[in-house]
Amino acid sequence: MKTIYYLFLLLFLLDCKDKVKPVDEQPPNPKEFLRSYVKNPNPNDRMCKDDIEQAEKDLEKYKNIYVTTSCFGCKTSPYADEIIEYAAKQKIEVINDIYSCVVMEGQTKGCYKAMIDLKMEEIHGKDFRHKIEHAAEQLMIQKIKTGTKILSVYDLSEEDQPNLVKENKFTRKEDILTVQTGLPLQHELDTYPFIDISFIVEKDGTISNVKNENWVSGFKRNEKYKNELEGLAKNKILTNYSKWKPGKYKNTLTRVENNFRVCFK
């Protein structure tokens, strides 16, 4: 089943890649283009007109709306949960607008958010979204300080990510580790069984919560070694990769979920 899943994922990515518009075909400022465009969309732009119609219905239903967006491969804000939490307290409805990777000629995506944003700015001013995002970020920072918020390593800029301490020096982490097992593992060319291990880099640079996130045997006969290989992977990380310079978010020390892929030979 996992082989089928990864094959499907690869095909999906390639399909999306084929359908993405070249950069030079995009408007110079998509945000401002949409704000102007929704006021007078092309009559044949069914996608945009449907989005505008839905936005108008939601504006009748909810007094205040904050629109989030999501798409395959899009980066999520580290304080996305706090936006929802803050918005609920302020009686602001959070609605997620999902963008498809498929581009249809003459059809425009993003009109729903543009329409809602325009209306909210008319009522609350140009900084409507900024105020919500700033409040949510401050809420997240408070959680970071108390240790109740764990950020992903991918939420941080490169200079703020945890750095591995080796021989009393800070080094960049190796994304893929290799363990020589001595076991009769089945493999093909450079394809070996692997396991994705996650762990938390604490504020004091130690690690905790080491766990298996994903196991790929490569071949059925390797399944019987799963528990043994998982133990080897965790032991290697706990032994050789347990000292870190902790991560930071805007100069605030934070707990960070990090990860390694461990391959077995």
Question: What label would you give each PLM region?
Answer:
Residues 22-265:
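Charge-biased low-complexity segments
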